[in-house]
């Protein structure tokens, strides 16, 4: 009976001491993994930041191109006198000599195409 108790006590002491070692090892492994995870997260965050900056640059470039190209210079509306040599009629309008009602004005006007 004493041998059983001694054996049990010996196994218990070994289990506790090895368990403590495993606990310390587990703690060290967890710290290493979290440090690696942080570095991976930092790297992933850095890559994501680069991609977002590239997208932002593309969007800003497109916006600036749109604002330069899409804005129409001041134009003359329909039925407004225009210069024959330098017509500034808005898009969809043409600078033409009036047919009936404006013959006496001797001027060109913007009309729809």
Swiss-Prot record:
UniProt-annotated stretches for the region Disordered: 61-83
Cysteines engaged in disulfide bonds, as pairs: 75-90, 82-95, 89-110
Subcellular location, principal: secreted
Propeptide: 22-74
Transmembrane region(s): none
Signal peptide (residue range): 1-21
Keyword terms: Disulfide bond, Ion channel impairing toxin, Knottin, Secreted, Signal, Toxin
GO molecular function: sodium channel inhibitor activity; toxin activity
Pfam family, one: Toxin_22
Reported tissue expression: Expressed by the venom gland.
A GO CC annotation given for this chain: extracellular region
Known role: Probable ion channel inhibitor.
Recorded family membership: Belongs to the neurotoxin 14 (magi-1) family. 01 (HNTX-16) subfamily.
Domain notes: The presence of a 'disulfide through disulfide knot' structurally defines this protein as a knottin.
Protein name: U11-theraphotoxin-Hhn1a
Organism, scientific name: Cyriopagopus hainanus (Chinese bird spider)
